[in-house]
Amino acid sequence: MKDPSRSSTSPSIINDDVIINGHSHEEDNPFAEYMWMENEEEFNRQIEEELWEEEFIERCFQEMLEEEEEHEWFIPARDLPQTMDQIQDQFNDLVISDGSSLEDLVVKSNLNPNAKEFVPGVKY
């Protein structure tokens, strides 16, 4: 006859699953939870390398901006789109001539009238 205290519905305890003081029985090393510190120097070195790399990239961007300002490659007044008022002012400043000054310009020209027409991207 079976002992009623050993019924099959109660959970059975296996020796491998026994946990004592928050550690499993298999952990013979009491310092196992601190083993991550073993590689702390390597981790710190890697983080320090990443910080140096970020600083280097930041310095490169700063130098590029200073170089751009030094050579005036970007001039907002020149490079940004103009407002409608500025365009209208420029349009009003245009002068329609009677064509006589254009004929004088053509007569004094040093350009070859028999030259081929320039087309961008086409090699001759």
From Swiss-Prot:
Ubiquitinated, leading to its degradation by the proteasome. It is found in: Cytoplasm. Residues 105-120 are annotated as: PABPC1-interacting motif-2 (PAM2). The keyword Ubl conjugation applies. Residues 1-13 have a biased composition (Polar residues). One of its GO terms (cellular component) is cytoplasm. Belongs to the PAIP2 family. Interacts with the second and third RRM domains and C-terminus regions of PABPC1 in a 2:1 stoichiometry. This is Polyadenylate-binding protein-interacting protein 2. It comes from Mus musculus (Mouse).
